[in-house]
Amino acid sequence: MKRLQAFKFQLRPGGQQEREMRRFAGACRFVFNRALARQNENHEAGNKYIPYGKMASWLVEWKNATETQWLKDSPSQPLQQSLKGLERAYKNFFQKRAAFPRFKKRGQNDAFRYPQGVKLDQENSRIFLPKLGWMRYRNSRQVTGVVKNVTVSQSCGKWYISIQTESEVSTPVHPSASMVGLDAGVAKLATLSDGTVFEPVNSFQKNQKTPARLQRQLSRKVKFSNNWQKQKRKIQRLHSCIANIRRDYLHKVTTTVSKNHAMIVIEDLKVSNMSKSAAGTVSQPGRNVRAKSGLNRSILDQGWYEMRRQLEYKQLWRGGQVLAVPPAYTSQRCAYC
Protein backbone atom coordinates (compact mmCIF):
# COMPACT_ATOMS: atom_id res chain seq x y z
CA MET A 1 0.00 0.00 0.00
CA LYS A 2 1.05 3.62 -0.58
CA ARG A 3 1.51 5.80 2.47
CA LEU A 4 1.53 9.59 2.45
CA GLN A 5 3.46 11.22 5.27
CA ALA A 6 4.47 14.80 6.06
CA PHE A 7 7.71 15.91 7.72
CA LYS A 8 7.74 19.44 9.14
CA PHE A 9 10.91 21.37 9.94
CA GLN A 10 11.82 24.93 10.88
CA LEU A 11 13.62 26.83 8.14
CA ARG A 12 16.71 28.97 8.67
CA PRO A 13 16.50 31.48 5.81
CA GLY A 14 18.76 34.43 5.15
CA GLY A 15 17.47 38.00 5.20
CA GLN A 16 16.91 38.21 1.45
CA GLN A 17 15.31 34.76 1.34
CA GLU A 18 12.90 35.73 4.12
CA ARG A 19 11.86 38.86 2.25
CA GLU A 20 11.33 36.81 -0.92
CA MET A 21 9.19 34.27 0.95
CA ARG A 22 6.99 37.03 2.36
CA ARG A 23 6.60 38.39 -1.16
CA PHE A 24 5.74 34.97 -2.60
CA ALA A 25 3.16 34.35 0.14
CA GLY A 26 1.63 37.77 -0.55
CA ALA A 27 1.43 37.05 -4.28
CA CYS A 28 -0.32 33.72 -3.64
CA ARG A 29 -2.76 35.43 -1.29
CA PHE A 30 -3.44 38.13 -3.90
CA VAL A 31 -4.15 35.54 -6.61
CA PHE A 32 -6.44 33.55 -4.29
CA ASN A 33 -8.43 36.61 -3.21
CA ARG A 34 -8.75 38.05 -6.71
CA ALA A 35 -9.94 34.72 -8.13
CA LEU A 36 -12.43 34.36 -5.26
CA ALA A 37 -13.75 37.88 -5.97
CA ARG A 38 -14.30 36.95 -9.62
CA GLN A 39 -16.04 33.74 -8.60
CA ASN A 40 -18.34 35.74 -6.33
CA GLU A 41 -19.16 38.18 -9.14
CA ASN A 42 -19.85 35.26 -11.46
CA HIS A 43 -22.14 33.66 -8.86
CA GLU A 44 -24.07 36.90 -8.28
CA ALA A 45 -24.65 37.10 -12.04
CA GLY A 46 -26.38 33.72 -11.86
CA ASN A 47 -23.66 31.72 -13.61
CA LYS A 48 -22.13 28.37 -12.67
CA TYR A 49 -18.85 27.82 -10.86
CA ILE A 50 -15.76 28.42 -13.02
CA PRO A 51 -13.28 25.48 -12.89
CA TYR A 52 -9.51 25.64 -12.48
CA GLY A 53 -8.77 25.58 -16.23
CA LYS A 54 -10.44 28.96 -16.71
CA MET A 55 -8.93 30.38 -13.52
CA ALA A 56 -5.46 29.46 -14.83
CA SER A 57 -6.10 31.69 -17.87
CA TRP A 58 -6.91 34.54 -15.48
CA LEU A 59 -3.46 34.14 -13.97
CA VAL A 60 -1.87 34.59 -17.42
CA GLU A 61 -3.95 37.76 -17.94
CA TRP A 62 -2.91 39.20 -14.58
CA LYS A 63 0.77 38.54 -15.27
CA ASN A 64 0.53 40.40 -18.58
CA ALA A 65 -1.49 43.30 -17.17
CA THR A 66 0.47 46.47 -16.44
CA GLU A 67 -0.74 46.93 -12.86
CA THR A 68 -0.01 43.32 -11.83
CA GLN A 69 3.19 42.54 -13.74
CA TRP A 70 4.92 42.09 -10.38
CA LEU A 71 3.34 38.61 -10.29
CA LYS A 72 6.00 37.52 -12.79
CA ASP A 73 8.64 37.88 -10.07
CA SER A 74 7.03 35.01 -8.12
CA PRO A 75 7.38 31.35 -9.18
CA SER A 76 4.50 30.16 -11.34
CA GLN A 77 3.81 26.87 -9.58
CA PRO A 78 2.91 28.33 -6.14
CA LEU A 79 0.53 30.76 -7.85
CA GLN A 80 -1.12 27.89 -9.72
CA GLN A 81 -1.31 25.87 -6.51
CA SER A 82 -3.10 28.81 -4.88
CA LEU A 83 -5.82 28.57 -7.54
CA LYS A 84 -6.00 24.80 -7.05
CA GLY A 85 -6.44 25.45 -3.35
CA LEU A 86 -9.42 27.67 -4.16
CA GLU A 87 -10.87 24.93 -6.37
CA ARG A 88 -10.43 22.43 -3.52
CA ALA A 89 -12.16 24.84 -1.13
CA TYR A 90 -15.14 25.08 -3.49
CA LYS A 91 -15.34 21.30 -3.85
CA ASN A 92 -15.33 20.91 -0.06
CA PHE A 93 -18.15 23.46 0.11
CA PHE A 94 -20.20 21.73 -2.59
CA GLN A 95 -19.78 18.39 -0.78
CA LYS A 96 -20.82 20.07 2.52
CA ARG A 97 -17.49 19.32 4.16
CA ALA A 98 -16.56 22.96 4.77
CA ALA A 99 -17.99 26.47 4.78
CA PHE A 100 -17.98 28.80 1.78
CA PRO A 101 -14.46 29.97 0.82
CA ARG A 102 -13.39 33.21 2.48
CA PHE A 103 -10.83 35.85 1.59
CA LYS A 104 -7.37 35.37 3.06
CA LYS A 105 -5.99 37.95 5.46
CA ARG A 106 -2.39 39.08 5.60
CA GLY A 107 -0.46 37.43 8.41
CA GLN A 108 -2.89 34.53 8.83
CA ASN A 109 -1.79 31.20 7.38
CA ASP A 110 0.75 32.75 5.00
CA ALA A 111 1.96 29.83 2.89
CA PHE A 112 2.82 28.67 -0.63
CA ARG A 113 3.40 25.25 -2.17
CA TYR A 114 5.89 23.76 -4.64
CA PRO A 115 4.63 20.59 -6.41
CA GLN A 116 8.02 19.94 -8.05
CA GLY A 117 11.47 21.39 -8.69
CA VAL A 118 12.59 20.80 -5.09
CA LYS A 119 15.95 19.23 -4.13
CA LEU A 120 16.53 17.77 -0.67
CA ASP A 121 20.03 17.39 0.80
CA GLN A 122 19.50 15.68 4.15
CA GLU A 123 23.18 15.12 4.88
CA ASN A 124 23.83 18.86 4.94
CA SER A 125 20.36 19.78 6.32
CA ARG A 126 19.42 21.97 3.39
CA ILE A 127 16.75 22.16 0.70
CA PHE A 128 16.59 23.85 -2.70
CA LEU A 129 13.45 25.82 -3.59
CA PRO A 130 12.89 27.47 -7.00
CA LYS A 131 13.67 31.22 -7.00
CA LEU A 132 14.89 30.94 -3.40
CA GLY A 133 17.96 28.74 -3.78
CA TRP A 134 19.46 26.50 -1.12
CA MET A 135 18.17 27.01 2.40
CA ARG A 136 19.08 25.34 5.68
CA TYR A 137 16.52 23.76 8.00
CA ARG A 138 16.57 22.22 11.48
CA ASN A 139 16.96 18.56 10.60
CA SER A 140 15.32 16.68 13.48
CA ARG A 141 14.54 13.36 11.74
CA GLN A 142 15.10 11.42 8.54
CA VAL A 143 12.76 12.05 5.61
CA THR A 144 11.66 8.77 4.03
CA GLY A 145 9.89 8.18 0.73
CA VAL A 146 9.61 10.10 -2.53
CA VAL A 147 9.02 13.84 -2.16
CA LYS A 148 5.64 14.74 -3.71
CA ASN A 149 5.27 18.40 -2.74
CA VAL A 150 6.63 20.98 -0.32
CA THR A 151 4.70 23.67 1.57
CA VAL A 152 6.40 26.72 3.06
CA SER A 153 4.44 28.45 5.84
CA GLN A 154 4.90 31.16 8.44
CA SER A 155 3.80 30.96 12.06
CA CYS A 156 4.67 33.30 14.96
CA GLY A 157 7.35 35.04 12.91
CA LYS A 158 9.13 31.80 12.01
CA TRP A 159 9.16 29.93 8.70
CA TYR A 160 8.50 26.21 8.41
CA ILE A 161 8.64 23.67 5.62
CA SER A 162 6.37 20.66 5.34
CA ILE A 163 7.66 17.90 3.05
CA GLN A 164 5.00 15.43 1.92
CA THR A 165 6.35 12.08 0.78
CA GLU A 166 4.90 8.89 -0.66
CA SER A 167 6.32 5.48 0.16
CA GLU A 168 5.37 1.91 -0.67
CA VAL A 169 4.86 -0.23 2.44
CA SER A 170 3.55 -3.73 2.98
CA THR A 171 -0.04 -4.07 4.17
CA PRO A 172 0.20 -3.90 7.98
CA VAL A 173 -1.44 -6.37 10.35
CA HIS A 174 -2.33 -5.06 13.79
CA PRO A 175 -0.57 -7.01 16.58
CA SER A 176 -3.65 -6.84 18.80
CA ALA A 177 -7.07 -8.40 18.26
CA SER A 178 -9.01 -6.41 20.86
CA MET A 179 -11.87 -3.98 20.31
CA VAL A 180 -12.55 -0.96 22.51
CA GLY A 181 -15.05 1.87 22.70
CA LEU A 182 -13.89 5.44 23.34
CA ASP A 183 -16.12 8.08 24.91
CA ALA A 184 -14.84 11.66 24.55
CA GLY A 185 -15.71 14.18 27.22
CA VAL A 186 -14.78 17.41 28.97
CA ALA A 187 -14.25 16.32 32.58
CA LYS A 188 -12.38 13.28 31.23
CA LEU A 189 -10.77 13.55 27.82
CA ALA A 190 -11.33 9.90 26.91
CA THR A 191 -12.90 6.98 28.75
CA LEU A 192 -12.41 3.52 27.26
CA SER A 193 -14.87 0.67 27.58
CA ASP A 194 -12.24 -1.35 29.48
CA GLY A 195 -12.17 1.25 32.26
CA THR A 196 -9.07 3.17 31.17
CA VAL A 197 -9.40 6.93 31.71
CA PHE A 198 -7.28 9.70 30.16
CA GLU A 199 -7.48 12.98 32.06
CA PRO A 200 -7.64 16.23 30.05
CA VAL A 201 -4.63 18.51 29.82
CA ASN A 202 -6.76 21.70 29.49
CA SER A 203 -3.90 23.67 27.96
CA PHE A 204 -6.01 26.76 27.22
CA GLN A 205 -7.95 26.74 30.48
CA LYS A 206 -4.73 26.72 32.50
CA ASN A 207 -3.33 29.67 30.54
CA GLN A 208 -6.44 31.67 29.63
CA LYS A 209 -5.61 34.61 31.94
CA THR A 210 -2.35 35.32 30.13
CA PRO A 211 -3.87 35.76 26.61
CA ALA A 212 -6.53 38.06 28.06
CA ARG A 213 -3.88 40.24 29.73
CA LEU A 214 -1.74 40.36 26.58
CA GLN A 215 -4.81 41.18 24.48
CA ARG A 216 -5.64 44.14 26.74
CA GLN A 217 -2.09 45.39 26.36
CA LEU A 218 -2.41 45.05 22.57
CA SER A 219 -5.60 47.15 22.51
CA ARG A 220 -3.72 50.08 24.11
CA LYS A 221 -1.02 50.20 21.42
CA VAL A 222 -1.09 52.03 18.10
CA LYS A 223 -2.24 49.62 15.42
CA PHE A 224 0.52 48.36 13.08
CA SER A 225 3.24 50.14 15.09
CA ASN A 226 6.43 48.28 16.03
CA ASN A 227 5.25 47.77 19.61
CA TRP A 228 1.89 46.55 18.31
CA GLN A 229 3.65 44.02 16.07
CA LYS A 230 5.83 42.82 18.97
CA GLN A 231 2.81 42.40 21.23
CA LYS A 232 0.92 40.51 18.54
CA ARG A 233 3.83 38.11 18.10
CA LYS A 234 3.78 37.48 21.86
CA ILE A 235 0.12 36.51 21.65
CA GLN A 236 0.75 34.30 18.63
CA ARG A 237 3.62 32.50 20.36
CA LEU A 238 1.48 31.88 23.44
CA HIS A 239 -1.40 30.42 21.41
CA SER A 240 1.09 28.32 19.45
CA CYS A 241 2.53 26.99 22.73
CA ILE A 242 -0.98 26.14 23.99
CA ALA A 243 -1.79 24.32 20.75
CA ASN A 244 1.52 22.41 20.86
CA ILE A 245 0.83 21.23 24.43
CA ARG A 246 -2.60 20.00 23.38
CA ARG A 247 -1.33 18.30 20.22
CA ASP A 248 1.56 16.61 22.02
CA TYR A 249 -0.74 15.19 24.69
CA LEU A 250 -3.23 13.96 22.09
CA HIS A 251 -0.41 12.20 20.23
CA LYS A 252 0.57 10.38 23.42
CA VAL A 253 -3.04 9.34 24.13
CA THR A 254 -3.85 8.22 20.58
CA THR A 255 -0.57 6.31 20.25
CA THR A 256 -1.30 4.40 23.46
CA VAL A 257 -4.84 3.53 22.38
CA SER A 258 -3.83 2.68 18.80
CA LYS A 259 -1.01 0.34 19.86
CA ASN A 260 -3.21 -1.72 22.18
CA HIS A 261 -6.46 -2.10 20.21
CA ALA A 262 -7.14 -3.25 16.64
CA MET A 263 -10.62 -1.69 16.43
CA ILE A 264 -11.60 1.57 18.11
CA VAL A 265 -15.25 2.62 18.20
CA ILE A 266 -15.82 6.35 18.67
CA GLU A 267 -18.77 8.73 18.64
CA ASP A 268 -19.44 10.58 15.39
CA LEU A 269 -19.50 13.96 17.12
CA LYS A 270 -20.33 17.17 15.25
CA VAL A 271 -18.00 19.43 17.19
CA SER A 272 -18.91 22.56 15.20
CA ASN A 273 -22.59 22.11 16.09
CA MET A 274 -21.84 21.32 19.73
CA SER A 275 -19.72 24.46 20.14
CA LYS A 276 -22.11 26.94 18.52
CA SER A 277 -22.93 30.13 20.38
CA ALA A 278 -26.17 30.30 22.37
CA ALA A 279 -26.44 34.09 22.09
CA GLY A 280 -29.32 33.95 19.59
CA THR A 281 -30.62 37.12 17.94
CA VAL A 282 -32.01 40.46 19.07
CA SER A 283 -35.59 39.28 18.60
CA GLN A 284 -34.90 35.82 20.05
CA PRO A 285 -32.09 36.10 22.61
CA GLY A 286 -30.53 32.90 23.90
CA ARG A 287 -30.50 31.57 27.44
CA ASN A 288 -27.57 30.65 29.69
CA VAL A 289 -25.22 32.30 27.21
CA ARG A 290 -22.35 32.70 29.67
CA ALA A 291 -22.49 29.06 30.78
CA LYS A 292 -22.69 27.83 27.17
CA SER A 293 -19.73 30.02 26.25
CA GLY A 294 -17.65 28.37 28.98
CA LEU A 295 -18.75 24.92 27.80
CA ASN A 296 -17.79 25.81 24.22
CA ARG A 297 -14.29 26.80 25.35
CA SER A 298 -13.92 23.54 27.26
CA ILE A 299 -15.09 21.48 24.26
CA LEU A 300 -12.68 23.20 21.87
CA ASP A 301 -9.86 22.95 24.43
CA GLN A 302 -10.02 19.13 24.31
CA GLY A 303 -9.38 18.79 20.57
CA TRP A 304 -11.87 15.98 19.88
CA TYR A 305 -11.61 16.23 16.10
CA GLU A 306 -7.80 16.23 16.25
CA MET A 307 -7.95 13.13 18.45
CA ARG A 308 -10.18 11.40 15.90
CA ARG A 309 -7.92 12.42 13.01
CA GLN A 310 -4.85 11.03 14.76
CA LEU A 311 -6.60 7.78 15.63
CA GLU A 312 -7.73 7.27 12.03
CA TYR A 313 -4.32 7.64 10.39
CA LYS A 314 -2.47 5.73 13.12
CA GLN A 315 -4.89 2.83 12.86
CA LEU A 316 -4.53 2.89 9.08
CA TRP A 317 -0.74 2.67 9.39
CA ARG A 318 -0.95 -0.15 11.95
CA GLY A 319 -3.60 -2.18 10.14
CA GLY A 320 -6.37 -1.34 12.60
CA GLN A 321 -9.72 0.33 12.11
CA VAL A 322 -11.71 3.25 13.54
CA LEU A 323 -15.49 2.93 13.50
CA ALA A 324 -17.62 6.04 14.06
CA VAL A 325 -21.14 5.39 15.38
CA PRO A 326 -24.06 7.77 16.09
CA PRO A 327 -23.51 9.44 19.48
CA ALA A 328 -27.05 8.83 20.76
CA TYR A 329 -27.21 6.53 23.81
CA THR A 330 -23.48 5.72 23.70
CA SER A 331 -22.77 6.79 27.31
CA GLN A 332 -25.48 4.79 29.08
CA ARG A 333 -23.33 2.25 30.90
CA CYS A 334 -20.00 2.39 32.69
CA ALA A 335 -17.06 0.12 31.90
CA TYR A 336 -17.96 -2.32 34.70
CA CYS A 337 -21.51 -2.92 33.43
Which residue ranges define each predicted feature?
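Gly/serine-rich nucleotide phosphate-binding loop at the start of the catalytic core
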Residues: 1-79
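Short glycine-rich, polar/acidic loop-and-turn segments at beta strand-coil junctions
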Residues: 15, 25-26, 36, 92, ...
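Acidic carboxylate diad motif detector
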Residues: 53-155, 280, 297, 301
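Positively charged, helix-rich recognition surfaces that bind polyanionic ligands
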Residues: 5, 19, 131, 139-146, ...
